[in-house]
């Protein structure tokens, strides 16, 4: 919501986007459990998040949105879960 508010207030001079990362750095011994929380079955890397930031920085026609970089973890709370 905050991303959209700022995008409306600052356009067209400024583009506002958010990045919502999932598990990247996890406690030792938690890798398997945290990876199971994502649809892709792994935790992310710092490079995964950095690539999303680079994409948004160069996307001249994108504003007011947040990009989930979480391996699909945000979808796990939906009623249609992975079998």
What are these model-predicted stretches?
Residues 79-83:
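A short alpha/beta connector and helix-capping loop motif
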Residues 29-48:
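Catalytic Tyr-x(3-8)-Lys segment
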Residues 41, 58-60, 78:
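Generic structural signal for alpha-helix termini and adjacent loop/cap motifs
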Residues 8-12:
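Alpha-helical segment proximal to the catalytic Tyr-Lys
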Residues 4:
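A short, exposed helix-loop element centered on a Lys and neighboring polar residues
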Residues 46-69, 74:
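C-terminal substrate-recognition "lid" of short-chain dehydrogenase/reductases
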Residues 15-25, 68-70:
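Conserved SDR Rossmann-fold cofactor-binding beta-strand/turn motif
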Residues 26, 76-77:
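Conserved protein kinase catalytic core
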């Amino acid at each position: 919501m905050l991303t959209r508010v700022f995008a409306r207030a600052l356009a067209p001079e400024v583009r506002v986007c958010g990045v919502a990362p999932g598990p990247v750095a996890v406690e030792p011994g938690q890798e398997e459990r945290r990876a199971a929380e994502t649809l892709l079955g792994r935790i992310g890397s710092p490079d995964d998040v950095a690539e999303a930031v680079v994409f948004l920085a160069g996307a001249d026609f994108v504003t007011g949105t947040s990009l989930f970089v979480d391996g699909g973890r945000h979808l796990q709370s939906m009623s249609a879960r992975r079998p």
